[in-house]
Amino acid sequence: MTYRVIQWATGGVGRASIQGIVSHPDLDLVGCWVHSAEKVGLDVGEICGMDFLGVTATDNVKELLALDADCVMYAPIFANRKEIVRILESGKNVVTPLGYFYPGKRDVSDLETACQRGGVTLHGTGIHPGGITERFPLMVSALSRNITHVRAEEFSDIRTYGAPYVVGEIMLFGKTPEEASKSPMLDVMGGGFLESIDMVADALGFALDDQKRTQHAVAIATRPIDSPIGIIEPGLVAAQRFTWEGTVRGQAVITVRTNWFMGEEGFDPAWSFGPEGERFEVEVQGDPNSKVSFRGWHPESVAAGLKRNPGIVATGIHVVSAIPYVVEAQPGIKTYLDLPLVSGRAAQEFAK
């Protein structure tokens, strides 16, 4: 069976998603929403640096919702909840990396109602959050008994993130520590990571305390550091670490952490990626302990990452891979705990 898909937004994740949709044997790209006026009317292939696809980009929501489509891959910079409700009510499933990984403790009655009205499903997935923080820890946890702690952690050179404005003006790299302390990222990312913690806790049976612990720490440059946002002068923020913890009687049992550095030299404190370098890590402490490092999701160089970042690609493809399973699911908000095991597909030259 072929599932008809609309791509919503064509940023880094969106472009990777389009590549994934086009190469997936069970998916067909039938529409594309774009934010930028200069992209309206262009063939989606041109936007993504691909061959002609025969799908024209538009910013006309009404026109897109009138299409005969099974699913929308929803990936703008920020989620518009009313827009998601509208898509669901139009009878289209939604997969997204922008949250809804495990929203049971939030008021999502409007989304649940929209799912029931449209007879469709909403599913949040991705990499971090959306994979490293819940799907993979849960898989690895099956190898241990008496689990006492689960950790999911990212170590990344933020210079490879191809959105300089976001890095400088939203993440607040290159600012003073006082300015960076006002970063919205702890709350913005926490919306997803706290859901991840709840999912792991519920699946493993941890009796979490009511409040989660959070921490935002920064390291400053000790020398000028060249970066895509310009020179980061000594005394300005060149590395950031965000931590979210689920605790039981005050003891951390689930830890999610993001380490974003402008390289890994010239910091105070002297943070580094360690001998293992850039990676994503999952660790389960129990009997026995397990530790898994995921590599290949970081570019080989800053220049390569600004052209194509494998971590961004992996995020988009993970969302796309879920589409057939989401379309076949019963209406409602569905998580990893509800869906079958999601897998990718063989390259065309090796397929059945």
Give, region by region, the residue ranges found by the protein language model:
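N-terminal glycine-/serine-/threonine-rich beta1-alpha1-beta2 phosphate-ribose binding loop
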Residues: 1-90, 205
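Conserved active-site and cofactor/substrate-binding residues in soluble primary-metabolism enzymes
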Residues: 8, 12-16, 59, 106, ...
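Alpha-helical support elements that line or immediately flank enzyme active sites
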Residues: 132-142
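C-terminal active-site/capping subdomain that shapes the small-molecule cofactor and substrate pocket
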Residues: 226-352
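Active-site-lining helix/loop region of Rossmann-like oxidoreductase modules
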Residues: 8, 141-270, 278-280, 309
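Rossmann-fold NAD(P)-binding glycine/threonine-rich loop
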Residues: 99-121
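A short hydrophobic/small-residue beta-strand
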Residues: 93-95
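Short beta->alpha connector loops at strand-helix junctions that form conserved
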Residues: 97-99, 126
